[in-house]
């Protein structure tokens, strides 16, 4: 089994017998569809401080060679609730994190460290998304709200 899938299993994903894994490319984006994986929710119902988020993310970001991690959304605006997810913008430039599987392992490791659901978008994906006229505002909002919670420099 590939190392990336082993990492999914390590973080609570369960392989269902006869599961299928589909992979395709669309507009130069590597798309992976996993049919038969489900992850049980074991989240912490609390509001983390920015410092706590930094402390939990740093070891994972360093392990993967991530350049920077930014917080946006309700946590960055100071509006987080106990059931809020954590929105992260990750700069993966200069890393080997190019496939959905490798990004998936990063996602799983960060989510495990935080013990809360996360939404993760890379800087390059944000740039691509912003090229669509209906999505320009999303990029502007993320860039305005973002708080640096990890910097490799």
Where do the model's predicted regions map?
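A structural signal for short, well-ordered beta-strand segments
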Residues: 71, 86-88
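P-loop (Walker A) phosphate-binding loop of NTP-binding proteins
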Residues: 74
